A protein has these predicted regions:
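Amphipathic alpha-helical "coupling" segments that flank catalytic cores
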Residues: 1-350
């Protein structure tokens, strides 16, 4: 392994030995994030430690296309477990569009750690993709990470904290860069890759834009929200219609500049019923979002259709009395804010 200290990873980012140490560190972070322990964690950390060792062997120096594959053979011959040798072979995957991801969770963790280290490092030294130029295939690497993350199996973690962990490791290695700026660039890079993946999967552009407008940055959360919206539109039209109508009626009149602090003493019975429904929905939607149960969050929002319809049937929002008018608009502002925590429903076509 010490020979890797003579192998340059990238001119401004140091050696492959330093990269290997960061991969191990991030792999440990990912294990903690996903609750991986025991033998599986040991295999992950061992594979992370050894995954670049074959770069100094004659076979890989001569034929770079066999990197990882040769490392797997060497690891097996040295008595490493099957899980470790398989992960070493797989950690470059997916190598190209349509390629399969690593076959095991051990391999996926090492693959993500390697790819994320490369992406963050190159962004830190101003080597991000530009236009059609992507010499380090960072878009493919990011899409590989997002695809693994959103595959719906036992491989789920928050990406933003992992990005933070990588950037902290680079800073600890003495690499100088604007941490906050690079952080935002990398996060936005992954958001864009997630958008591309979902569009390729047939998700409507308006659903993607609606979720983005809610400030969602985590690829897994983003994917689950847009899928829930698309499912409601295609498979549960009644719920989707309730969402659209309830939001639309309130949004047409709301005045954000007034805020949401309405005066309870000015509410009549119908207004009070709506505000009670809003307060209940706020709590239920927040709990559903915390549990990543986005269909439930949409169902809770759709349940507001009845009380808001009754509100508009019985109440003249634009009352001549300015105090009553502004108070009712504040109620509608708060109503719309509940929806905005999930998506910007104003961007959704019916």
């Amino acid at each position: 392994m010490d020979d890797l200290d003579a192998v340059v990873f990238q001119e401004k980012l140091g050696t492959t030995l330093a990269k290997s140490k960061r991969i191990v560190k991030l792999a440990g972070h990912l294990c903690e994030s996903m609750g991986i322990d025991g033998q599986e964690k040991e295999d992950i950390l061992r594979a992370a430690h050894l995954c670049k060792a074959d770069l100094v062997t004659g076979a890989v120096v001569e034929f770079t296309s066999v990197q990882g594959v040769m490392g797997s053979y060497y690891a097996k011959a040295a008595g490493e477990t099957d899980a470790v040798s398989q992960a070493i072979a797989d950690h470059y995957r997916p190598r190209f569009s349509g390629d399969n991801p690593p076959a095991t969770r051990v391999g996926k963790v090492v693959a993500v750690a390697d790819k994320l280290d490369t992406i963050c490092g190159l962004f830190a030294v101003d080597q991000a993709p530009t236009g059609s130029s992507d010499p380090f295939a960072l878009r493919r690497s990011a899409l590989g990470i997002v695809t693994m993350l959103c595959a719906g199996d036992d491989f789920e973690f928050d990406l933003v904290p992992a990005i933070d962990a990588v950037l902290a490791a680079y800073a600890a290695d003495g690499i100088e860069f604007d941490a906050q700026a690079v952080r935002e660039q990398v996060i936005e890079f992954f958001v864009t890759r997630t958008k591309v993946m979902e569009r390729d999967n047939g998700v409507s552009a308006d659903a993607i834009d609606a979720v983005l407008a809610a400030g969602v940055r985590e690829p897994l959360e983003f994917a689950k929200r847009v899928i829930a919206l698309e499912h409601a539109r295609r498979e549960d039209p009644d719920t989707f219609n309730d969402l659209a109508v309830a939001y639309g009626r309130a949004n047409n009149l709301r005045d954000p500049e007034l805020g949401v602090d309405y005066d309870d003493s000015l509410l009549c019975e119908v207004e009070h019923a709506l505000t009670c429904a809003i307060v209940q929905a706020e709590g239920r939607v927040a709990r559903a979002l915390e549990a990543n149960d986005y269909p439930e969050a949409l169902a809770e929002l759709a349940s507001l259709r009845k009380p808001v319809d009754l509100f508009f049937e019985r109440i003249m929002v634009m009352d001549e009395d300015a105090v009553l008018r502004e108070n009712r608009l504040k109620v509608l502002n708060r109503f719309v804010n509940v929806f905005s925590s999930v998506a910007d429903f104003g961007l959704l076509a019916k």
